[in-house]
Swiss-Prot record:
Signal peptide residues on this chain, from the entry's feature table: none
Annotated cofactor note: Binds 1 zinc ion.
Gene Ontology MF, one: metalloendopeptidase activity
Cited InterPro entries: MetalPrtase_cat_dom_sf_prd, YbeY, YbeY_CS
Domain of life: Bacteria
E.C. no: 3.1.-.-
Single GO BP term: rRNA processing
Gene3D superfamilies, alphabetized: Metalloproteases ('zincins'), catalytic domain (3.40.390.30)
PANTHER family linked to this entry: ENDORIBONUCLEASE YBEY, CHLOROPLASTIC
Compartmental location: Cytoplasm
The protein's name: Endoribonuclease YbeY
Length: 156
């Protein structure tokens, strides 16, 4: 299974090895979630100020966060579904704060690789419709995260 991922590094800090890590873990997740070949998403790396702006503008939370997901498959009010056109599946956009990922890796006592992989996977699962608004949903999403991280070798 192959995902098409467009990476944008606004921080100019992200090494190729981290891009490859995310490509591989999301590929593994797509395989385990049975996502069709050719599905697309973008991953943008930003600083804390930029993610704070996005969080404020789109979620009414004026503070930095670690990852934000914008799912393309959620129908907004007044949007029309396009039918009968063969287009690749557009999953959406992930925005990851690199400084926040570094802070959290240190805070949780694990590697930056593991934190970055976790954040990318967490956001990816949101793009697929997983959520953690209820206790039941949280159990399902976090259980799936753990399964995929362990299958990829990034378990705790």
């Amino acid at each position: 299974m192959s995902l098409l991922i467009d990476f944008i590094d606004e921080t100019e800090e992200v090494k190729e090895e981290y891009v490859n890590l995310i490509r591989e873990i999301l590929g593994k997740a797509a395989q385990m979630e049975k996502i069709e070949d050719g599905a697309e998403l973008s991953v943008t790396f930003v600083d804390n100020e930029r993610i704070r702006e996005i969080n404020r503008d789109y979620r009414d939370k004026d503070q930095p966060t670690d990852v934000i997901s914008f799912a393309m498959e959620e129908m907004g009010e007044g949007e029309m579904e396009i039918v009968g056109v063969e287009m690749p599946r557009m999953l959406g956009d992930l925005i990851i704060s690199i400084p926040r990922a570094k802070e959290q890796a240190e805070e949780y006592g694990h590697s930056f690789d593991r934190e970055l992989g976790f954040l990318a996977l967490h956001g990816f699962l949101h793009l697929l419709g997983y959520d953690h608004m209820t206790e039941e949903d949280e159990k399902e999403m976090f259980g799936r995260q753990k399964e995929i991280l362990e299958a990829f070798g990034l378990g705790r």
